[in-house]
Amino acid sequence: MTQLLNDFLSGSAAWGVLLTLAAFALGALINKMTGKAIFNPLLLGSIFVIVFLSVCKIPYADYKISAAPVNYLLLPATVALAIPLYEKIDLLKENAAAIIAGISVGTLVSLGSALALALALDLTREQYATLLPKSVTTAISMDVAAELGGIAALTGAIVIVTGIVGALLAETVCKLFHITDPIAKGVGIGTAAHAVGTSKALQMGEVEGAMSGLSIAVAGVLTAVLCPVCVNLIN
């Protein structure tokens, strides 16, 4: 049965895309039905895909090739986050200095936490380079990690986990530290948890979503510039 399924899938160029979309749709449905943040569609979708590939004994390499079109949509999807930002352009202009300062500090904290973890765990340069761009969107982080000598595929997994944790804790952290300003919420979430966190920010409000989308772009640029400097701190 498994061999028949493998033969069927090998003859279909789009099965990886269909599997990915179906897994995410099922995860989104469960998230909507339960209303629990822990049932994140991205997390559930990833688990469903892993289970399917494991049960059917389908090599990940085959899935990766078939699902490649989904990867091509990462950059356009990230760019599309500029739409809510454009709708709040006046608010951005009024608070430009505070927003840029917040994103800059958040980026430095992210890089600093990676350095502290690397020193505490005595990570190698390769491991540190893999961990360093953990808080920026996959479209940027994997390229940065590869350029620095890290393991890009592992970076992608770390980025996803970072985003999911950020999305899960976003509202709790805001309540804990009495953060009520929507701009501050959006900047914090976008800088720390990239696109996955931004999906949560959009649920919290239009301003939060717009500021989070901006933070992804600015934090991505700052991280790409600063990572080559930071990686040299580990011998």
Where are these regions (language model features)?
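N-terminal hydrophobic targeting signals that begin at the initiator methionine
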Residues: M1-Q3
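Helical membrane-embedded segments and adjacent short helical loop/helix-boundary regions
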Residues: L5-Y86, L91-G102, G106
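Transmembrane alpha-helical segments of multi-pass membrane transport proteins and ion-pumping complexes
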Residues: G16-L29, S46, I50, S54, ...
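Generic secondary-structure signature for well-ordered alpha-helical cores
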Residues: N31-G35, K57, G150, C174-I179, ...
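Membrane-interfacial segments
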Residues: T34-I38, P59-Y60, K64, D90, ...
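Residue-level detector of alpha-helical segments with a strong bias toward transmembrane helices
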Residues: I50, A67, A98, E147, ...
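Internal active-site segments that recognize and position negatively charged phosphoryl groups
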Residues: K88-I160, I164
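Alpha-helical membrane segments and immediately flanking helix-loop junctions
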Residues: Q127-L154, I158-V161, L176, T180-V218
